Amino acid sequence: MLKEVRPAVVSLLALTMITGLAYPLAVTGLATVLFPYQAQGSLVERGGKVVGSALIGQEFKGDEYFHGRPSATVAPDPADSSKTVSAPYNAANSGGSNLGPTSKALADRLSEDVAKLKAENPAAAIPVDLVTTSGSGLDPDISPEGALFQVPRVAKARGVPEEQIRKLVGASINQPLGGVLGEPRVNVLKLNLALDAAAPR
């Protein structure tokens, strides 16, 4: 009996050591050496202080900043732990809203967001990413069209010409990887930091 079981036990222990310890440590070590910025969470600093991650969306309030996509993240309801409440940009609980196309709550939120954006820039078509949430609820990027839509509001709030802000948006566009993978996008955190540097409030 022991003769038959021994190979299985040895294999289990060997594979546990290889896949559970050696491989993760090797990959973590290589990542830290080859890609230190990414391995540490793609943290973005300003003045030596971490202000966010380039991979996680965060909320920017006020007309003087570019705003990201709506967030669908939630948190436990303090009054009833079996329920959740809206908690935008809650990085501890990433996930979509799971609201379907027939959901009244989704329709109401979309109507409210569209009305707010139409009031902000009545002449322009509203880019879809400014009213839809991402699968994670924490998308750090918006489309170039989403950023350009917000230029008049930001320029007015900062008291600078729109053309200056448009150039800043143009310089902040990340192109698809290799020209084919992904879509052109603008990282909202990095754009707002560049905005603060170029046109202080």
UniProtKB/Swiss-Prot annotation:
It is found in: Cell inner membrane. GO terms for cellular component: plasma membrane. Its main location: membrane. It is a single-pass membrane protein. Pfam families: KdpC. Residues 73-102 are annotated as: Disordered. Signal peptide: none annotated. Keywords: ATP-binding, Cell inner membrane, Cell membrane, Ion transport, Membrane, Nucleotide-binding, Potassium, Potassium transport, Transmembrane, Transmembrane helix, Transport. One of its GO terms (molecular function) is ATP binding. Part of the high-affinity ATP-driven potassium transport (or Kdp) system, which catalyzes the hydrolysis of ATP coupled with the electrogenic transport of potassium into the cytoplasm. This subunit acts as a catalytic chaperone that increases the ATP-binding affinity of the ATP-hydrolyzing subunit KdpB by the formation of a transient KdpB/KdpC/ATP ternary complex. Belongs to the KdpC family. The system is composed of three essential subunits: KdpA, KdpB and KdpC. This is Potassium-transporting ATPase KdpC subunit. It comes from Rhodopseudomonas palustris (strain ATCC BAA-98 / CGA009). The gene is kdpC.
